Amino acid sequence: MAVDPRKVLPTKINLIRLRRELAMLRRIRRVMEEKREVILHYITSMAAEYVRYQREVYSELERIYQNYYLGVAAEGIERARAFTAPAEGSLEVDVSTRTLFAVKTPVFSLREETVPPLPLPAGSDPKLVQSILDMRSILDKLLKLAEYEETLQRLISELKDTQRLINALDYVILPSYQNAIKFIKLVLEDRMREDFVRLKIIKRKMEAKTQ
């Protein structure tokens, strides 16, 4: 998008065209700056929300694992492993998207039918049973946490792209247009001066002939 003054014909038409394009680019820059500020505000707000939610989920996970290890200690490793063996395998997640400031961000939802049922024999240690049930219930929160992380990464990437565009406008594109306009104006002004001098010379010659 940058303009090389040496490759632009110094004409009035090009001067008008470049001025119009420069005005349009300045409007684009203002829009980009507004977009940058909105994204930055949203990232700041979401980052704070993410940190709060992460602490909540990690605290809950810590409690679940504490109960799990206590339950394993009570039941024995082999018996506890027999409880969780049916859960081995892959869970499936549906991924959709939503748009924030022209940025596509993910929405994760667990496919319930892919979550295997866990056998919990009567008489099992209560802490082990509770930890297994809680682990199942926290899956949605873990997906929500992953949503936060991926959304923040995409917004930060968009922020960087927006800033790069603003920098390109500020340091390359806009200056090139300004220099091209300045160059054309100087050439046109020189031509006007030359035409003025030429007309004066012609006028003097014509006056000399009439005398």
Swiss-Prot record:
Write out the GO biological process terms.
proton motive force-driven plasma membrane ATP synthesis
A Gene Ontology term for the protein's cellular component: plasma membrane
Keyword annotations for this protein, in alphabetical order, are:
ATP synthesis, Cell membrane, Hydrogen ion transport, Ion transport, Membrane, Transport
Molecular function GO labels: ATP binding; proton-transporting ATP synthase activity, rotational mechanism; proton-transporting ATPase activity, rotational mechanism
Annotated coiled-coil positions are none
Stated membrane topology is: Peripheral membrane protein
Compartment list = Cell membrane
| Family to which this protein belongs | Belongs to the V-ATPase D subunit family.
Q: Summarize subunit and interaction data from the UniProt record for this chain.
A: Has multiple subunits with at least A(3), B(3), C, D, E, F, H, I and proteolipid K(x).
State the function annotated in the UniProt record: Component of the A-type ATP synthase that produces ATP from ADP in the presence of a proton gradient across the membrane.
Q: This protein is called what?
A: A-type ATP synthase subunit D
Q: Per the UniProt entry, what species is this protein from, by scientific name?
A: Aeropyrum pernix (strain ATCC 700893 / DSM 11879 / JCM 9820 / NBRC 100138 / K1)
